[in-house]
């Protein structure tokens, strides 16, 4: 049986980490694409030379021509400019929109049947634009945001409660920006909701609020520490979890930026919501009930995404 083919558009920090994880998890053969000739080839060779030590069989190729992604089962897009200290994700919109246009054309021509995961920021607007540029069916393209944001929240909670991260579940919905919505009511430790843990004296409401705020600012915290780039280990791990659910038809319920057609009262936007990812891509959008306060936060987040999408239309008339 032929191995699956995973194409990685962008061979920077996230792209290289994705390539390594895809091999370690034996998800398939990997093609690294980057416009910086030599970088994808070098990283691919380096990882291939680690395979005998780690004990996995996967072919690695590097390329600077989109023809190399032909027939890919999964395409993960990280191409674009990362954040620097003092920048918001939204500051990247002009330059990364141009990148999405080129990437979309490459996917449309060479990998029109792939399941596509977009990581490029500002995420919710870039995945929207990439769908338009690529012509992909909306169920075959998603944005990586909620898995990462939820993982950050889970890490902070596990540290606070001194329990395994495996026993902490968390839901972060909405746009991948400062208005994201960590849903405390739907987040649990071993099935016990966080509000109950506050009542039990495990933590205080103030500490919980601080963790929610730290989650919202989680990406910026790392940008400010690194000074020369943005997070890459956790974003790569998050995208690999999504790719694995598709390739293995695991049907995991994961918060992702998905195309909505009336769910949550939204039509025609990619917004972070819980979805089921299986062999057909987005198999189902899970609609959870919001309290009035949660709905207000979610609506604010959606308004931010709408603003970014309108900005994209203003920059590129083809999207209007």
Swiss-Prot record:
Q: Which cysteines are joined by disulfide bonds?
A: none
A molecular function annotated in GO for this UniProt entry is:
L-malate dehydrogenase (NAD+) activity
Output the GO biological process annotations, alphabetical, semicolon-separated.
Answer: lactate metabolic process; tricarboxylic acid cycle
User: CDD domains under this entry?
Assistant: LDH-like_MDH
The annotated active site, in chain numbering, is: 176
Which catalysed reactions does the entry list for this protein?
A: (S)-malate + NAD(+) = oxaloacetate + NADH + H(+)
Under Pfam families, the record lists: Ldh_1_C (PF02866), Ldh_1_N (PF00056)
Annotated keywords? NAD, Oxidoreductase, Tricarboxylic acid cycle
Q: Which InterPro entries match?
A: L-lactate/malate_DH, Lactate/malate_DH_C, Lactate/malate_DH_N, Lactate_DH/Glyco_Ohase_4_C, Malate_DH_type3, NAD(P)-bd_dom_sf
The EC designation for this entry is 1.1.1.37
Whether Oxidoreductase counts among this entry's keywords is yes
Binding-site positions, substrate: 83, 89, 121, 152
Q: Which domain of life is it from?
A: Bacteria
Binding of NAD(+) occurs at 10-15, 34, 96, 119-121
Supply the enzyme class, top level.
oxidoreductase
Q: Which PANTHER family match?
A: L-2-HYDROXYCARBOXYLATE DEHYDROGENASE (NAD(P)(+)) (PTHR43128), L-LACTATE DEHYDROGENASE (PTHR43128:SF16)
NCBIfam families under this entry? MalateDH_bact, PRK06223.1
Q: What does this protein do?
A: Catalyzes the reversible oxidation of malate to oxaloacetate.
Q: What name appears for this protein in its UniProt entry?
A: Malate dehydrogenase
Q: Which organism is it from?
A: Methylobacterium sp. (strain 4-46)
Q: Which gene encodes it?
A: mdh
